[in-house]
């Protein structure tokens, strides 16, 4: 598919220190905190000037919300929204007021069995601090050690904190199950595949509603047998009415290991709801939604494009910019550190969420809300998502992201990506949720007792 070239200056954008190839994308995020990059939470003093807007923004999606602190490069600010502002921006607040909180639903998240060290903390302590800081109910957290071994140590890095706190902020009544996977899950495609398949088995055995996977690798990383094993596991999830949401990745049109252009698994599998990234602009006072654009820092961006492994699924038939092959992502949400939700780490330090691994648990939480509203687990939601998006309620149920692109530099060469536009696009999918409309529609669109086939 022809792509309009994007003209961009030489990259000079600052990204969070220590970003790693995708499985648990924020594992080195404490380096940023230790460097003094932090954000203040609700009730902070006067707002600081926003970072310069990227070309094409209207007022900048990174409008200041709280006064930002930085010991990093001059004039670089990290700005954060509170969970309450996120709830308003994405239409969750009205659902919470009527008791749709995710109560009774279980969201499963695979996380590495981290070894204790200076870059890790206790997730229970962090969740408790998060709840106190932002007035949330106590989180219901379980840690499953089956895959990593009963004696596996568990301490949280910033990725684990991000996954759990975002789900808890959006679906505060849902139960959180952290499934520990072996620390070597990042080292090979075989180990990654085993970790994902094992997590899905654990979710099925616990009758979980949703699996939220923040890890990804480019399709070229996997052998055919591993792709097949992943697909079998995902089919089992669908058969047991478990929704799987996965991050599309943080490297635009290339994979985490660099060129060539490719999309990433598991998000590219048609049985997965793939989540891309945006930069959110919301009211600094009320949290009211003002707009979004494609997340892009020039060296990191919302990953998206077209699969080389999976043909176009039936639910994407007739979608204008999808050709013969599966298009990714399906949906998107905030992934930009300069427009992020504040997270609590190390018992009280606040830092910004970042990456499509922030969008993924948000969408997992939205599905959990819809599960509760429906009174049953929705399972494979992609056909319902596409049916709603292609119907008359699209612009009420979704925020259509129509500006920006996912071109990236690697390391100094520009890889031209895809522009966002009206409707579905390979930068932000259908866009981000307006949950107060989308959740009831999802609850109505799906049916209990069987798969809505692709």
Identify the meaning behind each predicted range:
Residues 2-48:
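Secretory targeting and sorting signals
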Residues 10, 20, 318-319, 371-426:
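An often Trp-containing, charged/polar helix-loop segment at the C-terminal end
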Residues 48-274, 303-355, 360, 371, ...:
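Substrate-binding/charge-relay-adjacent region of secreted/lumenal peptidase catalytic domains
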Residues 278:
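A short beta-strand-to-loop transition that corresponds to the Sensor-1 phosphate-sensing loop
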Residues 281-287:
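Short acidic, Gly/Pro-enriched loop/turn segments at secondary-structure junctions
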Residues 291-309:
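Extended ligand-binding clefts on enzyme/binding-domain cores
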Residues 366:
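Walker A/P-loop NTP-binding active-site region of P-loop NTPases
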Residues 451-454:
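Ser/Thr/Gly/Pro-rich low-complexity, disordered linker/stalk segments of secreted
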């Amino acid at each position: 598919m022809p792509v309009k070239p994007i003209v961009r200056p030489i990259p000079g954008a600052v990204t969070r220190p220590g970003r790693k190839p995708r499985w648990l994308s924020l594992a080195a995020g404490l380096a940023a905190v230790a460097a003094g990059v932090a954000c203040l939470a609700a009730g902070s003093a006067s707002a600081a000037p926003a970072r310069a807007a990227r070309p094409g923004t209207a007022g900048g999606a990174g409008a200041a919300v709280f006064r930002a602190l930085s010991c990093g490069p001059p004039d670089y600010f990290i700005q954060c929204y509170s969970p309450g502002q996120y709830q308003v921006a994405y239409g969750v607040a009205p659902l919470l007021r009527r008791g749709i909180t995710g109560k009774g639903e279980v969201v499963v998240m695979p996380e590495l069995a981290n070894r204790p060290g200076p870059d890790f903390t206790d997730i229970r302590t962090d969740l408790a601090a998060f709840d106190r800081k932002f007035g949330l109910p106590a989180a219901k957290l379980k840690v499953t050690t089956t895959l990593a071994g009963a004696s596996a140590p568990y301490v949280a890095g910033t990725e684990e904190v991000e996954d759990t706190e975002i789900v808890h902020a959006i679906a505060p009544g849902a139960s959180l199950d952290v499934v520990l996977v072996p620390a070597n899950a990042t080292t090979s495609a075989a180990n990654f595949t085993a970790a994902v398949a094992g997590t899905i088995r654990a979710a099925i055995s616990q009758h979980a509603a949703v699996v939220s996977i923040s890890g990804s690798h480019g399709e070229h990383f996997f052998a055919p047998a591993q792709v097949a094993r992943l697909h079998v596991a995902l089919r089992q999830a669908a058969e047991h009415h478990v929704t799987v949401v996965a991050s599309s990745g943080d490297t635009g049109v290339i994979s985490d290991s660099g060129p060539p252009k490719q999309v990433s698994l598991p998000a590219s599998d048609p049985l997965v709801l793939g989540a891309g990234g945006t930069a959110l602009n919301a009211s600094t006072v009320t949290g009211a939604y003002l707009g979004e654009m494609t997340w892009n820092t020039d060296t990191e961006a919302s990953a998206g494009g077209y699969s080389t492994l999976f043909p176009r699924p039936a639910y994407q038939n007739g979608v204008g910019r999808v050709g013969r092959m599966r298009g990714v992502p399906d949906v998107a949400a905030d992934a930009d550190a300069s427009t992020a939700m504040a997270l609590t780490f190390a018992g009280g330090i606040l830092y910004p969420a970042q990456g499509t691994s922030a969008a993924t648990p948000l969408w997992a939480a939205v599905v959990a809300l819809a599960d509760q509203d429906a009174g049953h687990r929705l399972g494979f939601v992609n056909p319902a998502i596409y049916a709603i998006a292609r119907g008359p309620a699209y612009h009420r149920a979704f925020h259509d992201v129509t500006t920006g692109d996912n071109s990236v530099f690697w390391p100094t060469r520009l890889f031209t990506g895809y522009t966002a536009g009206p409707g579905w696009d390979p930068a932000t999918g259908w866009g981000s949720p307006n949950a107060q409309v989308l959740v009831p529609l999802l609850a109505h669109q799906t049916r209990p007792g069987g798969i809505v086939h692709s």
